Every structure is written in structure tokens, then in C-alpha cells.
Amino acid sequence: MATERSLTPDQIVAYHRDGYLNLPGFFAADELAPIQAALADDPSVGGRIATVHDGSEKTRHDYLGWTRHGDDWLGVATRLARIVEGAAVLIGEPVYHYHSKLVKKPAGRSGQVVWHQDYGGWYQDGCLMPDMLTCVVALTPATEESGCLHMLKGSHKMGRVDRIRDMDAYANINPKRLVGMLARFEDVAIAMQPGDGLFFHGNVVHRSGDNRAGYDRMLLEFSYNGVGNAPVLGNQDHHAAKPMKVVPDDALSNGDFLGVIGSTPLNDLSDPADEGYTIYVRDGFPDLS
């Protein structure tokens, strides 16, 4: 299924130069209305939203996660041609859905996420190459006040940076190295309005701040991997390359989905026994079997 909204040559160049690509108005208001209404009606999604803490028990944010996709709004959005084809062009090979998250920073909550690389965690999953990226879609305004993303522009060119602890996906970067990174790379705040999109490389160093605003900051984060880069380590069946039926760009606006949050299996990211637990937390190094 080909997209009618292909990335331009200039956009592709910008992504590889900077490590990210802003896409204003990537989703229309009517496309987002169903998921926004569902979250307003049931903010905890039936109690399935979990909370992430850092090592000091400072609350970060609330989230849902999924690795498989159904035919509800969440599952269809995951498979939209404009996202999947864009990811494939930027990665340089066909892609599959790795995992996705709804990330919410409640109003007024301390919810910062420290500087990190996503591929630092995905490498622990067993992905040998950084041929991975995330597509972010804003559901509410993301500003400096509400805790928007920050990118170190061009930092993906460093390659994978060693982590100084291995207990979760946001393990710290060595502080001395981080000082050098902040001196070398421009710190860019990524302000987003509802519907704006963002592709960013698995190796770009990024963070987000506390939400000091009077509303919840909510983002959808769809992550994709090259089909030839599936994890080689054990206990990663949920991250294996899976067939994905790509849907037309107008699927959401045409209402071609069955419910909003329903048939897409949501992972219990607070339960270490759940297959999708490693979307966020990794207990040291994964099983080498």
C-alpha cells in the first residue's frame, strides 16, 4: 500500500543530517478525535495505564504499550502507509512494527526523562544494528512548559553510547561524556501541536522535561525496525519480525477501524512476567539462550 504523502528528498537529507525530522500537521484533527475522546472519557484506560519511576522513585510518566496490532484505532494508526513507508525510506529497507506506546505526563507532575538513546535499550533486546526509529504524534500540545522532547541535533552520528546502568530503557549516559555532548551538539526543543509528527533515529540522544502545564501532555510513539534486524537474543518473541498489513493513509479519516482501544493487545508494562515488559524495563542483560 503506497502512501500519497511520501517524504521529499530534502526531508530525507534533513533526517540523516539531524537525526530527526519534524512533520507539522502529520495527522488531521478528525483523525485524532476518536483517540482523544476515548482518553478524555477514560483517562486510565480501564486501569491499564501504568506509571514509570526512575531509581529515586521520582515519577516519570504514565503509559500504555503494545507490540501486536488489531483492527481498532490503535492498531490501524500503527499501520498507516504514511508512517510505515516513511520509516522504510529513512531506515533503508522494509520495516516491521517493533512496539508502540501512548505516553502521558499528567498535569503538574514531575516527569522528566534523562538524556538517553533508544537504541541503547534495543541493543540489549538483541538488535545488532541501529536500523530503527520512532514516529511521534502529538495528541496534546507539547511545549517547554508541558515537557516536550529535546534532541541533541546530529548526535546519532556518534553511534551507540555505552550506558552506565542497565536496569531500564532510559539508563544514564556517562556524565563526563554528556558534558562533551552538550558542548558539541545543539540542544533543540521539539515543540509540537496536536497532529504534528516527528521521526527520530534510534541513536539520537534525547530527553524530556517535567510537565508544569495545566493539562496532560500526551504523545503516541510508534517504533519500527528493519526486517533484517530482528533481535537475535532469547525472550524476544514479541519483538520478532511480524507480517504487517499496511493500510491507506485515509483509513482513520474514513472510519476504517473497529473501536478505538479494543482489539490491539495492550502489554502490562508493570508486570515483569508480561511479554512486552522490555518495552521499558530490562533486568540487566537479556537471556543469551
Indicate residue ranges for each PLM-predicted region.
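Non-heme Fe(II)/2-oxoglutarate
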Residues: 45, 49, 55, 197, ...
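Non-heme Fe(II)-dependent double-stranded beta-helix
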Residues: 1-18, 23-126, 164, 235, ...
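Short edge-strand/loop segments of extracellular domains
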Residues: 105-106, 152-159, 223-229
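Active-site glycine-rich loop that binds ribose-phosphate moieties when present
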Residues: 114-123, 137, 176, 183
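A short beta-loop-beta micro-motif enriched in histidine and acidic residues
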Residues: 83, 121-132, 185-186, 192, ...
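Short, conserved beta-strand element in jelly-roll/cupin
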Residues: 116, 125-144, 191-194, 223-227
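Generic beta-strand structural signal
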Residues: 93-100, 111-113, 131-137, 147, ...
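Double-stranded beta-helix
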Residues: 13, 142-205, 209
